[in-house]
Design a protein with these regions (language model features):
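Asp-box/BNR beta-propeller blade signature and adjacent active/binding-site loops
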Residues: 83-87, 116
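Catalytic domains of carbohydrate-active enzymes, especially glycoside hydrolases
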Residues: 40-59, 84, 124
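N-terminal amphipathic/basic-hydrophobic helices that include classical n-h-c signal peptides
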Residues: 1-25
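Internal, well-ordered alpha/beta segment that forms a basic, Gly-enriched binding/recognition surface
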Residues: 117-176
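Glycine-rich, proline-tolerant flexible connector loops at the mouths of alpha/beta enzymes
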Residues: 60-75
Length: 423
């Protein structure tokens, strides 16, 4: 069997950095990674190395969904990252096509292409793959610049505005049945003063700006995004939670042999938000869902991306309890937090606040499964970020602040655990 080339080690990737949290205690800590959108990203790898990033989370965004990632393309990306003294730590994402999710006629062909891409990644020494099994909508927010009161802004989800989009713009059949009477009353009030500009903003925020850069279903170049979105939703007519689960199990069982051969860790991202939306089934939203997914395919390579932000957006989720339960099957950690407001709206919170309890999460993962790749995920727009045209949620200064906060938490937790050097 052909062996994979030796990828850059974490030690090699941080040799020139004065303070490496990875090795401060002589043992592995959470690896500080950063989601980077390729060479066209305005945030360069040189910038990331200067702020202490050790590993890169990225994808081959130029390859259409469902096409094979060639070994040559993978190697080119890996070597480019390694030239900047970091490593390609996680693929986020190798997209799972909608046809695989709803069980279309071409799913076996698409799964075979997925397997080839996985094998090529394994041959090139890239072994952690974040993906999602959310139908149509990768993640949802209604406001991308919600003011925080200190000059910064964060992502926000309003149930009423989302319901307005569903009932008044998308005009989904039977949509009203999915909302409370209070929410529908608010939708009617909004309909009296919402302008065409307001409606355009909602469309952009919900199905364009948050989607085009992550899965390509709808992009800013599409002239009729609402019509495209309706056609995508129609693909899931008749697909309930049990059928989507069966399709996920089918996919995972098909790819596990190559994952075992090349030690590929698949880590599913939780539903974001972990709530019923648009009548679509959701299968990674709570404790019971995660337990089902891991037990349905009990292979160690079938694991979880522990996204604290997504999970904390559901008031039903006790995030630290989930971390304790599933740390051993977690392959990748997203650290961010949310505040759930009365009525169920939620706002992305500071990494030092909110209901995710990030300090406790670091304690849990450092104690149970140290060495996992971690990224700080979304962060506020601040210090001119809003002028740079960054992808929604992925600011530079906001994430840099969050990374510094989390790095301080990591060092403090190691001191608490009694393993940090004294004096």
């Amino acid at each position: 069997m052909e062996s994979a080339p030796k990828p850059i080690s974490r030690a090699e990737g941080v040799q020139s950095y004065t303070y490496s949290s990875t090795f401060i205690t002589g043992r592995l800590m959470l690896e500080k990674t950063w989601r980077w959108f390729g060479r066209q990203d305005k945030i360069t790898l040189d910038m990331l190395r200067q702020i202490g990033v050790e590993g890169i989370v990225t994808a081959l965004h130029h390859i259409p969904n469902g096409e094979v990632w060639s070994r040559e393309d993978i190697r080119s990306m890996r070597e480019y990252i390694e030239q900047h003294h970091m490593r390609w730590s996680v693929v986020e994402s190798l997209p799972v096509c909608e046809s695989i999710k709803y069980g279309g006629k071409d799913r076996d062909e698409l799964i075979e292409k997925y397997i080839i891409s996985l094998e090529n990644l394994g041959r090139e020494g890239v072994h952690t793959i974040c993906y999602n099994f959310m139908p149509v909508l990768d993640w949802a927010r209604t406001d991308l610049t919600h003011p925080n009161g200190d000059g910064t802004s964060s992502l926000y989800f309003s149930h009423a505005e989302f319901a307005y989009f569903d009932c008044k713009i998308l005009k989904r059949k039977g949509a009203e049945a999915g909302y409370t009477a209070e929410t529908l009353e608010e939708v009617e009030r909004m309909s009296h003063h919402f302008t065409a500009e307001d409606e355009h903003r909602l469309v952009e925020n919900i199905i364009v700006k948050t989607q085009g850069f992550v899965n390509g279903n709808i992009t800013e170049h599409d002239e009729r995004p609402v019509e495209i979105f309706r056609s995508l939703l129609a693909l899931y007519d008749g697909i309930d939670k049990e059928q989507l689960r069966a399709n996920m199990k089918y996919f995972l069982e098909a790819i596990m042999p190559v994952c075992n051969r090349w030690e590929m860790n698949m880590c599913v991202h939780p539903d974001d938000p972990p709530l019923q939306i648009l009548g679509l089934p959701r299968i990674v939203s709570c404790d019971q869902d995660i337990e089902w997914m891991l037990n349905a395919v009990p292979d160690k390579h079938n694991g979880l991306t522990f996204c604290a932000g997504s999970l904390s957006a559901g008031a039903h989720n006790d995030v630290p309890a989930l971390a304790r339960k599933y740390a051993g099957r977690t392959h990748f950690v997203h650290l961010r937090s949310t505040n759930v407001l009365p009525g169920g709206d939620f706002k992305e919170a500071s990494h030092l606040g909110g209901r995710a309890h990030i300090i406790e999460l670091v304690r849990i993962f450092q104690s149970i499964n140290p060495g996992l790749p971690m990224r700080v995920d979304h962060a506020p727009l601040m210090l001119g970020d809003e002028k740079m045209g960054y992808n929604a949620g992925y600011s530079f200064h906001g994430r840099m602040l969050a990374l510094g906060q989390v790095e301080g938490i990591m060092a403090t937790v190691d001191d608490e655990l009694g393993i940090a050097p004294k004096g």
